[in-house]
């Protein structure tokens, strides 16, 4: 089935082996356990084993890890003939990205004695970075080769770490749930990549750029996993105690309100007042994205529900009206609609975070101001300036993401072969008659395009 241009017999093994060998060498030279992981360092100090950060952070890490490998992977299985590619390539680029992210984040966020120290929190942060890459993957789903995806991941992880360093370390931005650093960055990076990869003849594969009953059901599995674990995602690296508790609670109510808004808007905007599974699979998650920045702040359950409600409405409207405009006018072919699930809700979350930060007072936060806004607590800046920093961070994130998406890519499958597993995967024998039929169609379409 695969022709010369899509064969991976040589290219993929070479790229995978070279990348992994380089990673192993770099890990050997630069990475070591942190003091809570190292046997000698841990036992040189006087403390109870249950004080180890592992017992506080690992439950959240488990949830985040499930979101990365099952949630994101299955959410993208809605394409009728691209289930292997959705879950399989998600697995591939996530495995690479979390290793590369460990190095890049460790390098930019400070090395100790010339070494990158790793522990459970660095694992969570690497998964966060990987999540941003998978968001971008959603924008180009079905239109890229594994080599392209690994190339994109390498560039994006590096730029993610740069953006994260500028925001969190230099500016003191608060973004625990990643509305800006993860969702906005990943969405607009992916949108720029898919714009650069614009395919004028992609309509030749439009009959495969759709779902069937069982593929939508599989995608809904991803949605449910993401929905259930999103409170852990947003609260995973916040300060222990009230901060983590508050973040999970705010996310919980934002998601619930978003879901009702999604169902309502889907019925209003869809044909004959019926629900559109695309809306339910995606827009119901927008509340988790939109509350990511302000989740650890004193947003209140009431405020969280408003944010989630607005996010659901915006997301559904984006799927219904904005996505067709982006494709027809701006030539942005966003396969999974990441602009509607991650892009616009991420921007909304950044704005909500900026406003909430600007309104922060000691009367509301008390001594808790030290955890949420340490620069405000120590008098370095006032709350209004913190709000300005949050707004500036959104602009910086958008700039780096859009410019970073201008990367050189190669090895793309032909327009007639997009959204199809058979290009890169061995499919079960039961699919053989269908594949044989598609081979004839491909030949005819290729001849038409060449003429």
From Swiss-Prot:
Transmembrane segments: 12-32, 64-84, 88-108, 122-142, 152-172, 177-197, 217-237, 248-270, 275-295, 299-319, 341-361, 391-411
Pfam families linked to this entry: Ammonium_transp (PF00909)
GO molecular function: ammonium channel activity
Keyword match Magnesium: no
Topology in the lipid bilayer: Multi-pass membrane protein
Record keywords, A-Z: Ammonia transport, Cell membrane, Cytoplasmic vesicle, Glycoprotein, Membrane, Transmembrane, Transmembrane helix, Transport
InterPro entries in the cross-refs: Ammonium/urea_transptr, NH4_transpt_AmtB-like_dom, RhesusRHD
GO biological process: ammonium homeostasis
Major localization listed first in the record, in broad terms: membrane
Residues bearing glycans: 44
A Gene Ontology term for the protein's cellular component: cytoplasmic vesicle membrane
Cytoplasmic side of membrane: 1-11, 85-87, 143-151, 198-216, 271-274, 320-340, 412-451
Stretches assigned to the Extracellular side: 33-63, 109-121, 173-176, 238-247, 296-298, 362-390
Source species, domain of life: Eukaryota
Subcellular location: Basolateral cell membrane; Cytoplasmic vesicle membrane
Family the entry assigns: Belongs to the ammonium transporter (TC 2.A.49) family. Rh subfamily.
Known function: Functions as an ammonia transporter. May play a role in the elimination of ammonia in the gill.
Protein known as: Ammonium transporter Rh type B
Record organism: Tetraodon nigroviridis
Upper classification of the organism: Eukaryota, Metazoa, Chordata, Craniata, Vertebrata
Gene (UniProt): rhbg
